[in-house]
Regions:
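Conserved HGGG/HGGXW glycine-rich cap/lid loop of the alpha/beta-hydrolase fold
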Residues: 14-68
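Catalytic active-site module of serine/aspartate enzymes centered on a nucleophile-bearing elbow/loop
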Residues: 226-272
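Active-site nucleophile elbow and catalytic-triad environment of alpha/beta-hydrolase enzymes
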Residues: 171-187, 201
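Conserved alpha/beta-hydrolase "nucleophile elbow" surrounding the catalytic nucleophile
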Residues: 37, 101-103
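Short beta-strand/loop motif that positions the catalytic acidic residue
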Residues: 191, 197-199
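Flexible "cap/lid" loop of the alpha/beta hydrolase fold
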Residues: 107-115, 119-153
Length: 272
């Protein structure tokens, strides 16, 4: 697997840990990897890079209060993270990009597509819920925070924030997850780019919620990987990589033999 070049960049006054892969000529389109919540780029990028490293120019960054990027005022709310993603796309990638987002990264990808559709070529949304009321309460309102020695050591090694901020960040994440995101079916129906909804069959949210997300987006595909959880990217990396490769091979609207959801659009396309 090709390594990414990793360094800090100044993103509109904030030092953000950024990663970039090799560019493969003019036909090599950018793809931005969006990590999950309370995570970082290096904790998951190796699971998906093999799917795109020979076909795309790979970009990634640690969001504020994640990985090697310090926290700042407003961090963790999804509107804040969406605006930060838009700034990164505009300033670092400098144009429209494909997005691959896991968990919170998938949420942010959908929100970027809603707020700035001109910047999004396609989305792979992995283990993504569109609303906090997703069929299962993920966290308690006032959870007891237990930080292992290993997690504390990783935070101290990576984060520019002082040690006490680790608990502050975790509590803020739980607070946000109990009230955000709040996307609606009507909003999702406005997403026009190709979307692959990729999920485990035993996510922390309901399968019904996943189906709602898939059926709401006009140009979406659905992949449910059997025998996996929210960590589908790590549990069955090869299958996930294959699904992503297949998605990128043909981003045109899917024409199938016996469509139901796609029947009306299929008939329109066949008339042309």
């Amino acid at each position: 697997m090709r390594k990414l070049t990793r360094n800090y960049i100044n993103l509109r006054g904030h030092q953000v840990w950024s990663a970039q892969g090799k560019t493969f000529g003019k036909k090599s389109e950018p793809v931005l990897l969006m990590h999950g919540g309370l995570s970082s780029t290096e904790s998951w990028d190796y699971t998906v890079i093999p799917a795109v490293q020979r076909t795309h120019s790979v970009f990634a960054y640690d969001r504020s209060a994640h990985g090697r990027t310090a926290s700042r005022e407003g961090f963790y709310h999804f509107d804040f993270q969406t605006d930060e993603a838009i700034a990164y796309i505009e300033d670092a990638i400098k144009g429209p990009t494909h997005l691959i987002g896991w968990s919170d990264g998938g949420i942010i990808s959908l929100m970027v597509a809603l707020k700035r559709p001109d910047l999004v070529k396609s989305i792979v949304a992995i283990g993504t819920n569109y609303h906090f009321d997703s069929g299962l309460s993920l966290v308690e309102e006032d959870p007891e925070i237990v930080i292992s020695e290993d997690d504390a050591a990783k935070f101290a090694l990576r984060s520019p924030d002082p040690a006490h901020m680790q608990e502050v960040i975790i509590r803020k994440a739980y607070e946000v997850w109990n009230s955000e995101p709040t996307m609606t079916i009507a909003q999702l129906s406005r997403i026009s780019c190709p979307v692959l909804v990729l999920t485990g069959d035993d996510e922390p949210f309901s399968n019904h919620h996943t189906i709602e997300l898939y059926e709401a987006i006009p140009n979406a595909r659905l992949a449910i990987v059997p025998g996996t959880s929210h960590f589908v990217v790590k549990e069955k990396s090869k299958i996930v990589q294959g699904l992503i490769k297949d998605f990128y091979r043909d981003l045109d609207y899917p024409i199938t033999i016996w469509p139901r959801l796609r029947k009306e659009q299929t008939e329109k396309l066949k008339e042309k």
